From Swiss-Prot:
Role played: Catalyzes carboxymethyl transfer from carboxy-S-adenosyl-L-methionine (Cx-SAM) to 5-hydroxyuridine (ho5U) to form 5-carboxymethoxyuridine (cmo5U) at position 34 in tRNAs.
Top EC class, one word: transferase
Protein name in UniProt: tRNA U34 carboxymethyltransferase
Organism expressing this protein natively: Haemophilus ducreyi (strain 35000HP / ATCC 700724)
Residues engaged in binding carboxy-S-adenosyl-L-methionine: 89, 103, 108, 128, 150-152, 179-180, 194, 198, 313
Subunit description: Homotetramer.
Catalyses which reaction(s): carboxy-S-adenosyl-L-methionine + 5-hydroxyuridine(34) in tRNA = 5-carboxymethoxyuridine(34) in tRNA + S-adenosyl-L-homocysteine + H(+)
Length: 320
């Protein structure tokens, strides 16, 4: 199993120390109900080699060895990493292995990063962090501490495998809880919520919970699906959206900024809009499932398979 005690020690003397009132018990309860494959995945993750010669988190997530692994060892590493499929967020370059993930998450980071308040020395929360790709990029920007939350057991084990291959780097930590399970800490300088809002049945509650984690004046980075339209336009799919069951509300940018104002955020502004392309989300050998090409109308890629507007995403910044 994955040991969270080093994280408890890290935050014990920090302004996150109040979290220790609830977190250890929550994680004990989480382990009791974890996925039946969690122990197997965790064993794979925690047995990864931990001695890279150097790491690069500035323009990619990379761990380099002075000498290439012998081919047999490299193939065994690939075999073990593929036991943790599907790999959705990345890519990773680890000990000579290129994990070519479904999403080119570096594309999103290139869209987001230029607009952010500098992350250097900040304490950061990444909500719905997946396997933690963007957390490592935040570390690469000299963040003081990055905490990701995502309740998915496989993502936790992918994150721990990457952490090991990066030399057991402790500047980022993934906690397998949902945002609604966190006590309001008001302790993070920057809070990210990327690709989460449209999965929430109550988006305003989600925004309020994000605000409760920020220090006064802290920065929210909200990246989500949007539609074209004015302040009154919000898409509520009748059934599925791009084959996803759990998509509830997709607002226009104007509607989304209005939501943020209602929650009490200040200086809400849209800094980027982009249509999701087949270059950014696609099937690879590290993902056996369907991907974006299967979710779009084969005769008109401006629409989803259900006839709704194809995925378009916006980055919104606001301050608590």
């Amino acid at each position: 199993m994955i040991d969270f005690r080093p994280f408890y020690q890290q935050i014990a003397t920090s302004h996150l120390s109040a979290w220790l009132e609830t977190l250890p018990l929550q994680l004990k309860q989480w382990e009791k109900t974890a996925h039946s494959d969690y122990a197997k995945w965790a064993k794979i993750a925690t047995s990864m080699p931990t001695s890279p010669t150097s790491i690069n988190l500035t323009d990619k997530v990379e761990a380099v060895l002075a000498e290439a692994l012998p081919e047999g060892e490299k193939q065994y590493l690939i075999y073990r990493l593929k036991q943790l499929m599907p790999w959705r967020k990345g890519p990773y370059h680890l000990h000579g292995v290129h994990i070519d993930t479904e999403w080119r998450s570096d594309f999103k980071w290139q869209r987001v990063l230029p607009h952010l308040a500098p992350l250097k020395d900040r304490t950061i929360l990444d909500v719905g962090c997946g396997n933690g790709y963007h957390m490592w990029r935040m570390v690469g920007e000299d963040a003081q501490m990055v905490v990701g939350i995502d309740p998915t057991e496989l993502f936790l084990c992918q994150f721990e495998a990457v952490r090991q291959l990066l030399g057991n780097d402790r500047r980022a930590n993934l906690i397998p809880l949902g945002l609604e399970q966190m006590q309001p800490l008001a302790a993070f300088d920057t809070v990210f919520s990327m690709g989460v809002l449209y999965h929430r049945k109550s988006p305003l509650d989600h925004l309020s919970q994000l605000k409760a984690q920020l220090v006064k004046g802290g920065e929210l980075v909200l990246e989500t699906l949007i539609i074209d339209g004015d302040i009154n336009d919000i898409l509520t799919p009748a059934d599925r959206y791009a084959k996803m069951k759990n998509v509830y509300f997709i607002p226009s940018v104007a509607a989304l900024i209005n939501w943020l104002k209602k929650i009490g955020f200040k200086n809400a502004r849209c800094v980027d809009q982009s249509v999701t392309t087949l270059a950014e989300q696609r099937k690879t050998e590290w993902l056996e499932n369907e991907s974006l090409v299967d979710f779009l109308d084969p005769t008109d890629q401006r629409k989803t398979i259900e006839g709704l507007p194809a995925p378009k995403r916006a980055v919104i910044l606001a301050n608590a």
